Amino acid sequence: MAYEFASRLETFPKYRKFETTFAGRPFVVETGKMCGLSNGSAMIRYGETCVLCNVTMSDKPRDGVDFFPLSVEFEEKLYAAGRIPGSFMRREGRPGEHAILSSRVVDRPIRPLFPKDMRNDVCVTMTVMSLDPDCSAEISGMNGASLAIAMSDIPWGGPIAGVFVGLVDGEIVLNPTKEQREHSDLSLTLAASEEKIVMIEAGANEVDEETMMKAIRAGHEEIKKMLAFINGIVAEIGKPKKSFTPVELDHALLADVYAKHLDEVKAAMDTDDKNVRDAALLPIMDAIAAEHPDLTAADLDLISYKLQKKVVRTWLLEDGKRVDGRGINEIRPLAAEVGLLPRVHGSGMFTRGQTQVLTICTLGSTKDAQLMDDLSDTPYKRYIHHYNFPPYSVGEARAPRSPGRREIGHGNLAERALIPVLPDQAEFPYTIRCVSEVLSSNGSTSQASICGSTLALMDAGVPIKAPVAGISCGLITDGDPLHGGRWMTMLDIQGVEDFHGDMDFKVGGTRRGITAIQMDIKVDGLTYEIVEEALEKCRKGRLYILDEIIKPVIAEPRAELSKYAPKMFSMMIPVDKIKDVIGKGGKVIQEMCANFNCKIDIEEDGHVFISAVDQDDAKRAIATIKTIVEDPEIGAIYKGRVTRLMNFGAFVEIAPGKEGLVHISKLDDHRVEHVEDVVAVGDPIFVMVTDIDQQGRINLSRKDALAAIAKKRAEAGQQ
């Protein structure tokens, strides 16, 4: 039987390639070759960074949900950087912290532009396939995701585009290289549409508000160029948008509910106590359910949301009134406290209204730093901030879960806010971990975590350069602010204002300037005027917290560390001496760690870090290391250990690998007949270096060492 084998070259008739320049580097889009079954797909090549972006949508809406089910996944493949994963299976597992944070950065600008009444599942996936350290995979993924959605048949109000903005030597730099990022005072990820700012995520070295606005404006100008490029592609190959089945309530039913129950909802919500408000709303919703038995649980949730939203927004826009009776720029009652937990290294509790966070600071050695097995620029982290949000903090009766994306994002925000004020590792050679436990939540827990971390760090004696505080600003709009619509910002939003408002603009910083920003919105973007007003309100609120709340409680870091904290010391040794300190098979360093109850970390450049709970143990380890790396000096006294006995004297080890001879005549101040009459193998004895011959052999004297020690004691006694 004969077999025929056909061979043909696969062609891609829909393949298209588009090229432009983005912040001075080539930016290439390829479509029509890969992922033909996705609703929208694009391979982004920025420099040598390659990110494959796909978007898909379910054919039918998901039943029983009262939200838009959007999933955004940023997948980091270590092969992109030529690395094999460090896990046991040598395979990528669950998304790491960096991938989760990148997913959130892309999620936040694209989510508000989807129809709010759509319930079809939408999944956006960005896979990093090649990484050029000078060309951000995150920005490439954001722009690629925007393009993929815009050119797909999925309903969406985009596109948006993103850019990374740095500040190097006082100059604004767009999409800075890896080297520039290392020296930048600003790390700003910006997303925008043609006319509005859609997302801000920033870390900064105390940058002032004016400079921040300049960076935002500069980034927006570059974004407009990318948007023109994306719109050109969509105009050429974009698909017609699909229709979808919107989730709607019967207008007559909603009008009936408003007429009967809106005043009741207003009365229930007119309180500053979240528990009282929630309890007062329950019977109202029970009455609505009884009046309309055909409503589903999702329908009732939507009605409750619309009722509360109408009350909150009407009060603010029409009456300038807030739910809890505060003024528009008034901060909730504040309280701060330090030193709550006796055995921890540092603790601080910050309370703002019904929001309360307790932060605990723990100090560790350099070995405790977090190793980063991902595609981030940082190989390890010496400052770690973890944020925990237990169910009891919102009065829920359920078992706690492992940290989700929100917890990781809030922890990272507080982490970025504090990093600029931390001491250099050379000055303070500790790994620092802060854990923020949310005890009660009614809005702005991430900003309370920033304040709590400042308190805990100073209570622990960490010499931070300046205290940091955080506060948020909200927004209510009626119509498009860009075209005459009304809007109002308010300082220090609580939970109900966050839930029913249009913005959560979070800013952390010192008296000098901003250290972190995170902006979440539910509208299609913000004007420059709104951003500027939010920054200014947060600045004033931040200064009030620093001066009136934090400073009276703890004005500066404690002078001494907790007695339970490890004492850290650092020193430099010659690189060629590292092997001597470690010893064969690690014998020397292991013996020192065991003998002095300490941890010793040695870096490739000769930096040595010693940590011990007892300061004297650490100092003894330092002295031993010095004896190993330094040549013995004539006249120096050492505490050594007898290793061998001979007829003519005793050999004494004054440092690992360094032995000298104490002649029998130098053992004591009287005639010694037998060496074993004075010392035995293993005895610790004081010896003085008396001579080093041309061959490097060391001559020691116990007699001279004892005489010198006795003389010093006598002199000390006379004084």
Kindly give the residue locations of the regions a language model identified.
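Long, basic N-terminal domains or extensions that often function
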Residues: 2-245
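Glycine-rich, flexible beta-strand/loop modules in the N-terminal catalytic cores of phosphate-handling
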Residues: 38-122, 128-130, 135, 194, ...
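Short beta-alpha junctions and helix-cap segments that line functional grooves
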Residues: 40-41, 174-177, 185-188, 370-373, ...
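Conserved phosphate/anionic-ligand binding catalytic regions in large, soluble enzymes, centered on
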Residues: 40-43, 135-153, 338-361, 442-462, ...
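Single-stranded RNA-binding regions, centering on S1/OB-family and related RNA-binding modules
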Residues: 564-568, 575-719
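Extended amphipathic alpha-helical scaffolds
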Residues: 2-58, 62, 242-377, 566-580, ...
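Mobile "lid/hinge" segments at catalytic clefts and subdomain interfaces of large enzymes
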Residues: 153-268, 457-559
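Flexible, glycine/charged-enriched surface loops at secondary-structure junctions
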Residues: 116-122, 157-159, 226-244, 275-276, ...
